[in-house]
């Protein structure tokens, strides 16, 4: 394994397909997936508290074809033809489809940044809790709440009606959080980079207001795809490979025929350990699972600066290690090998999570005898069943076409942590305390990469097997 901290790359892919929608959407039994009941088709994980197990290992994006049965339309009032009357229906307090806000003052952006940090933290923990339940037990996973939220927030530029309300609720945003796009842009740092791109079929007209707002706020304008599906597939996969530094070389093997709109977001981590580990001290040691132990390469340091404490509520130790560019690597690990990560996950409420992070940020770094494994984590999940706004989406601000519906969402992530750091000699200037602290990571643990400036998790996950 190369001795370096390789860029962590993530990709969130959103496909939208066109199916004729004339009125209320009704899913016919003939269009359900094998083993799925009619009631299952309308479930969503985060909004209503119910979750559906997705096929997390599927190599291609699932496409849900909907058979739409027109509903009978009746007028709310019956009036004689000879006596026309004025409508008694009052206009709504706000427009059905809000125009994108592309200008915010500095004070508005600063205020939005504080709100966004809190919202991303709430969103992150709810996603983690859903993943920890739906993923197979004792398996690794990693995701970027920042990447997922960035793409869903970009959709907000063109969302209207209930779709907009549902998205804001899902992301823990206040209603009409118009300066969120500027706040997201302000969250960019040298430690990680976010890329967005929209591809669409040539027959789908994108509104100029959306294209202009997307370019100004996210740095990309929608790009049309040609009629050659092979060339379109190559164009998309090339974009993915380039933006993820070849960590994800081929996301899609084929493009569904009815795909009309593809939204992509990739996040690449360039931060490294602020203080490198000595590769000469890395040795093979046991990593304890529930009923066995495996041998893995363990990085060791007798005087590594760690901010750590044992939380009374969780009764579990937590530690924070410094990365470059104002980022931290936070670890929550069971207290002993007799305790299990699942118990920690169940006890980690939003209030407890925020309290732990706050305590770790307030705790000073001390020279610590640190033992932790090299890490290699890869994860892929189909996000379609996590969100319930997607079943009848309103993208009136993005296109005039009412037929566009979401058919697939996929998220991919990889992480590899080794000894390499920004300053390979900095460890030599750390003095050894008389009472040396001990922080050992030799069993399954929860981790997150924390942005110290804006107070939110960029990445989050768990490790059961450090070898991946």
Swiss-Prot record:
Modification after translation (UniProt): N- and O-glycosylated.
Signal peptide (from-to): 1-23
Gene Ontology biological-process annotations: blood coagulation; fibrinolysis
GO molecular function: serine-type endopeptidase inhibitor activity
Top-level taxon of the source organism: Eukaryota
One Pfam family from the record: Serpin
Gene3D superfamilies associated with the record: Alpha-1-antitrypsin, domain 1, Antithrombin, subunit I, domain 2
Marked site: Reactive bond: 434-435
Subcellular location(s) per record: Secreted
Glycosylation sites recorded in the entry for this protein: 65, 176, 227, 326
Record has Signal as a keyword: yes
InterPro entries according to UniProt: Serpin_CS, Serpin_dom, Serpin_fam, Serpin_sf, Serpin_sf_1, Serpin_sf_2
Keyword DNA damage: no
Alphabetical keyword list: Blood coagulation, Disulfide bond, Fibrinolysis, Glycoprotein, Hemostasis, Protease inhibitor, Secreted, Serine protease inhibitor, Signal
Region annotation (Disordered) ranges: 27-60
GO cellular component terms given for this protein: extracellular space
Cystines in this chain: 97-396, 104-179
Described purpose of this protein according to its UniProt entry: May play a potentially crucial role in regulating important physiological pathways including complement activation, blood coagulation, fibrinolysis and the generation of kinins.
Family statement: Belongs to the serpin family.
Miscellaneous comment in the UniProt entry for this protein: Could be the ortholog of SERPING1.
Protein name, UniProt field: Factor XIIa inhibitor
Organism: Bos taurus
């Amino acid at each position: 394994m190369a001795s370096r901290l390789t860029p962590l790359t993530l990709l969130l892919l959103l496909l939208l397909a066109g199916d004729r929608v004339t009125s209320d959407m009704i899913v016919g039994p003939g269009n359900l997936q094998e083993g799925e009941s009619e009631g299952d088709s309308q479930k969503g994980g985060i909004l209503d508290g119910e979750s559906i197990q997705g096929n997390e290992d599927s190599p291609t994006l699932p496409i849900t074809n909907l058979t739409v049965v027109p509903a009978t339309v009746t007028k709310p009032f019956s009036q004689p033809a000879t006596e026309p009357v004025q409508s008694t229906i009052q206009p709504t307090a706000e427009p059905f489809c809000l125009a994108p806000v592309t200008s915010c003052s500095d004070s508005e952006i600063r205020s939005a940044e504080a709100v966004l940090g809190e919202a991303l933290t709430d969103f992150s923990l709810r996603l983690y809790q859903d993943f920890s339940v739906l993923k197979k037990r004792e398996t690794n996973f990693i995701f970027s709440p920042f990447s997922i939220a960035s793409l869903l927030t970009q959709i907000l530029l063109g969302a209207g009606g209930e779709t907009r309300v549902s998205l804001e609720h899902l992301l823990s945003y206040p209603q009409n959080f118009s300066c969120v796009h500027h706040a997201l842009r302000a969250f960019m740092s040298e430690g990680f980079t976010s890329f967005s791109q929209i591809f669409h079929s040539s027959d789908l007209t994108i509104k100029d207001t959306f294209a202009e707002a997307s370019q100004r706020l996210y740095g990309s304008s929608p790009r049309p795809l040609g009629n050659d599906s092979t060339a379109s597939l190559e164009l998309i996969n090339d974009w993915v490979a380039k933006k993820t530094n070849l960590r994800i070389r081929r996301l899609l093997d084929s493009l569904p025929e009815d795909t009309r709109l593809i939204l992509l977001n990739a996040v690449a981590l360039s931060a490294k350990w602020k203080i490198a580990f000595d590769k000469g001290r890395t040795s093979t040691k046991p990593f304890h699972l529930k009923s066995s132990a495996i041998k893995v390469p363990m990085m060791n340091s007798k005087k590594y600066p760690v901010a750590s404490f044992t939380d009374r509520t969780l009764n579990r130790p937590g530690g924070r290690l410094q990365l470059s560019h104002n980022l931290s690597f936070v670890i929550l690990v069971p207290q002993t090998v007799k305790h299990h990560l699942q118990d920690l996950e169940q006890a980690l409420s939003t209030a407890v999570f925020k309290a732990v992070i706050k305590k770790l940020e307030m705790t000073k770094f001390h020279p610590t005898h640190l033992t932790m494994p090299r890490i290699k984590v890869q994860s892929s999940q189909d996000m379609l069943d996590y969100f319930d706004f997607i079943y009848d989406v309103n993208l009136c601000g993005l296109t005039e076409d009412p037929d566009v519906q979401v058919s697939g969402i996929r998220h991919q992530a990889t992480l590899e942590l080794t000894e390499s750091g920004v300053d390979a000699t900095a460890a030599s200037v750390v003095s050894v305390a008389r009472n040396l602290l001990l922080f050992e990571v030799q069993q399954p643990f929860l981790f997150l990469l924390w942005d110290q400036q804006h107070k939110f998790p960029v990445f989050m996950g768990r490790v059961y097997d450090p070898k991946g």
